[in-house]
């Protein structure tokens, strides 16, 4: 009988210990989990802008003069910038944070110079990724910049 009473008093002094341990571990687990979610979002965004650059370069290889909607006859959706911006599903990558440039091998913007079939054309995208988790304080303003580029040879000069 004495052992039973001792056991109860021993357990009584540790009452709530598991709740405190769970609260401490849950806090650390949530911080790590939010960091992993940010990493996943960043990886998805990086893959999405790589796909967007590839889509833009493919369209630029077929229609090298249609860089953006300002060119006559190249209104949306028939231009490189529109194709690159709309490659990713809606809402997952912010189109407003994409900076898209189209350039030819000689560094020009491919608009005024003579375009030659077989000449490389490059689409470069710089994307501003906003981190949301607790590790966002580790980078300036909580923003990372992802850069992707794709190169295709001009297939048809129209």
Q: Which residues fall in each region the model found?
A:
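Intrinsically disordered, low-complexity boundary segments flanking structured domains
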Residues: 45-46, 84-91, 134-138
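Short amphipathic secondary-structure patches
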Residues: 51, 55-126, 156-158
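Alpha-helical assembly-interface signal, strongest on the long, hydrophobic N-terminal helix that forms
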Residues: 2-84
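Generic N-terminal initiation segments characterized by hydrophobic and/or small/turn-forming residues
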Residues: 1-2, 7, 36, 89, ...
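Transmembrane beta-barrel outer-membrane domains
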Residues: 23, 116-118, 141
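Low-complexity, S/T/G/P-rich flexible repeat/linker segments used as non-globular hinges
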Residues: 2, 130-158
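A generic fold-level signal
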Residues: 14, 116-118, 145
């Amino acid at each position: 009988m004495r052992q039973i009473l001792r056991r109860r008093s021993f357990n009584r002094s540790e009452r709530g210990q598991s709740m405190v341990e769970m609260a401490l571990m849950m806090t650390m687990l949530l911080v790590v989990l939010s960091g992993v979610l940010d990493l996943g979002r960043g990886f998805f965004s990086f893959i999405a802008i790589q796909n967007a650059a590839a889509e833009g370069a493919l369209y630029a290889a077929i229609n090298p003069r249609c860089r953006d909607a300002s060119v006559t006859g190249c209104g949306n959706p028939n231009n490189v910038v529109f194709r690159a911006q709309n490659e990713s599903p809606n809402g997952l990558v912010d189109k407003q944070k994409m900076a898209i440039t189209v350039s030819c091998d000689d560094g020009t913007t491919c608009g005024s110079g003579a375009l030659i079939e077989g000449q490389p054309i490059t689409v470069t995208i710089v994307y501003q990724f906003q981190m949301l988790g607790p590790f966002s304080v580790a980078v300036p303003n909580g923003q990372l910049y992802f850069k992707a580029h794709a190169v295709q040879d001009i297939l048809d000069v129209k």
